[in-house]
Amino acid sequence: MATGKIVQVIGAVVDVEFPQDAVPRVYEALEVQNGKEVLVLEVQQQLGGGIVRTIAMGSSDGLRRGLEVKDLEHPIEVPVGKATLGRIMNVLGQPVDMKGDIGEEERWAIHRAAPSYEELSSSQELLETGIKVIDLMCPFAKGGKVGLFGGAGVGKTVNMMELIRNIAIEHSGYSVFAGVGERTREGNDFYHEMTDSNVIDKVSLVYGQMNEPPGNRLRVALTGLTMAEKFRDEGRDVLLFVDNIYRYTLAGTEVSALLGRMPSAVGYQPTLAEEMGVLQERITSTKTGSITSVQAVYVPADDLTDPSPATTFAHLDATVVLSRQIASLGIYPAVDPLDSTSRQLDPLVVGQEHYDTARGVQSILQRYQELKDIIAILGMDELSEEDKLVVARARKIQRFLSQPFFVAEVFTGSPGKYVALKDTIRGFKGIMEGEYDHLPEQAFYMVGSIDEAVEKAKKL
């Protein structure tokens, strides 16, 4: 085991000098004793002259030149398998929940090759989420990739928590949750939410929070992914939740300049597309098992053309766009039904009835959008009878797209609802065909199925 010494420390980036004949390979892990702590470094570049440039997987406070560094001669390895379920780990797979050792039987390196073409499999099966707007407008494929796009505070994390809860309870599969650069408070809430709904023993949690150095945030997504790959290779259907994929990009940006790379557009790292591709290509389904991934994507300044969300779009099967305008109307989940898309919304996959209903809902909402200007200037009275009907139905549809969440019961005070896909289609079809024209639009707000709306109307 070769040893070297630290020659330079700049923030999270540490240069280490080794003997010329024992230079560590790129992505190998190094260890340095920093006071009482053992700090892990990951090799990023070989600079020549026996010097390697590394990223610290923890705080580099207290490091000094001349400290001895050991080459572990393998990449960072993390525990995988059933022992990780119900536990909270950091980027190195060390437990941070004060519950003792993980007790794993196997450790895997976090850097792995993506599955080959022969191993890949595609599936047309739908994954029912119980959330009306998602199941109807942008259905998820089992083994597909979903992005939740939204600016700050429109509900990405709450939507994700609801998805995990619904899928864990209704489908009883394993999930891996990678918290990448998010708030520690959310991580804590998330753990307690999972414990309260009794699904914690089906979820592995890996956290690299906002307050941690960029090295942790850059690699924690790979740690979570490696755990998910193990479950997949055992022949399971596993869910991988990443909150937030933008922070993964951001951590790369933070270390990119320190690693001596020229910045590209908007100051992002020049390797943005490649880093995203390396991660996304591993999140895939094979003939053995499937990984369905749901990724929250923060949209800086609500600008979907920013290089980071724009790069993410290319990898996804379904995009759920959360809109600030819809949130400001008090409609939650604040999913924009005209902006959200899914490759699965195809009559050959979802069936003709589902397809026609979804497209019908979109056309009514689109027409309402066009009429809004006329209403604002001239008022409702100037519209034709036909348009008045469209507006009335559109407003009912808009309210019916809202739904009380289980994970938000504490805030809303109303019990959560899981709505089966057939009930969702029946409800929206009925509204479009005019079966519920006699009901007031308030009856459709924050209910589950259409039957609840009818009941609510009797009380109004």
UniProtKB/Swiss-Prot annotation:
<dbReference type="InterPro" id="IPR055190">
    <property type="entry name" value="ATP-synt_VA_C"/>
</dbReference>
<dbReference type="GO" id="GO:0016887">
    <property type="term" value="F:ATP hydrolysis activity"/>
</dbReference>
<keyword id="KW-0375">Hydrogen ion transport</keyword>
<dbReference type="GO" id="GO:0045259">
    <property type="term" value="C:proton-transporting ATP synthase complex"/>
</dbReference>
<keyword id="KW-0472">Membrane</keyword>
<keyword id="KW-0067">ATP-binding</keyword>
<keyword id="KW-0066">ATP synthesis</keyword>
<keyword id="KW-0547">Nucleotide-binding</keyword>
<dbReference type="Pfam" id="PF22919">
    <property type="entry name" value="ATP-synt_VA_C"/>
</dbReference>
<dbReference type="InterPro" id="IPR050053">
    <property type="entry name" value="ATPase_alpha/beta_chains"/>
</dbReference>
<keyword id="KW-0813">Transport</keyword>
<comment type="subunit">
    <text>F-type ATPases have 2 components, CF(1) - the catalytic core - and CF(0) - the membrane proton channel. CF(1) has five subunits: alpha(3), beta(3), gamma(1), delta(1), epsilon(1). CF(0) has three main subunits: a(1), b(2) and c(9-12). The alpha and beta chains form an alternating ring which encloses part of the gamma chain. CF(1) is attached to CF(0) by a central stalk formed by the gamma and epsilon chains, while a peripheral stalk is formed by the delta and b chains.</text>
</comment>
<dbReference type="InterPro" id="IPR000194">
    <property type="entry name" value="ATPase_F1/V1/A1_a/bsu_nucl-bd"/>
</dbReference>
<protein>
    <recommendedName>
        <fullName>ATP synthase subunit beta</fullName>
        <ecNumber>7.1.2.2</ecNumber>
    </recommendedName>
</protein>
<dbReference type="InterPro" id="IPR027417">
    <property type="entry name" value="P-loop_NTPase"/>
</dbReference>
<dbReference type="GO" id="GO:0046933">
    <property type="term" value="F:proton-transporting ATP synthase activity, rotational mechanism"/>
</dbReference>
<keyword id="KW-0997">Cell inner membrane</keyword>
<dbReference type="InterPro" id="IPR005722">
    <property type="entry name" value="ATP_synth_F1_bsu"/>
</dbReference>
<keyword id="KW-0406">Ion transport</keyword>
<dbReference type="InterPro" id="IPR020003">
    <property type="entry name" value="ATPase_a/bsu_AS"/>
</dbReference>
<dbReference type="GO" id="GO:0005524">
    <property type="term" value="F:ATP binding"/>
</dbReference>
<keyword id="KW-0139">CF(1)</keyword>
<keyword id="KW-1278">Translocase</keyword>
<dbReference type="GO" id="GO:0005886">
    <property type="term" value="C:plasma membrane"/>
</dbReference>
<dbReference type="InterPro" id="IPR024034">
    <property type="entry name" value="ATPase_F1/V1_b/a_C"/>
</dbReference>
<comment type="similarity">
    <text>Belongs to the ATPase alpha/beta chains family.</text>
</comment>
<dbReference type="InterPro" id="IPR003593">
    <property type="entry name" value="AAA+_ATPase"/>
</dbReference>
<keyword id="KW-1003">Cell membrane</keyword>
<dbReference type="InterPro" id="IPR004100">
    <property type="entry name" value="ATPase_F1/V1/A1_a/bsu_N"/>
</dbReference>
<dbReference type="Pfam" id="PF02874">
    <property type="entry name" value="ATP-synt_ab_N"/>
</dbReference>
<comment type="function">
    <text>Produces ATP from ADP in the presence of a proton gradient across the membrane. The catalytic sites are hosted primarily by the beta subunits.</text>
</comment>
<dbReference type="InterPro" id="IPR036121">
    <property type="entry name" value="ATPase_F1/V1/A1_a/bsu_N_sf"/>
</dbReference>
<feature type="binding site">
    <location>
        <begin position="150"/>
        <end position="157"/>
    </location>
    <ligand>
        <name>ATP</name>
    </ligand>
</feature>
<dbReference type="Pfam" id="PF00006">
    <property type="entry name" value="ATP-synt_ab"/>
</dbReference>
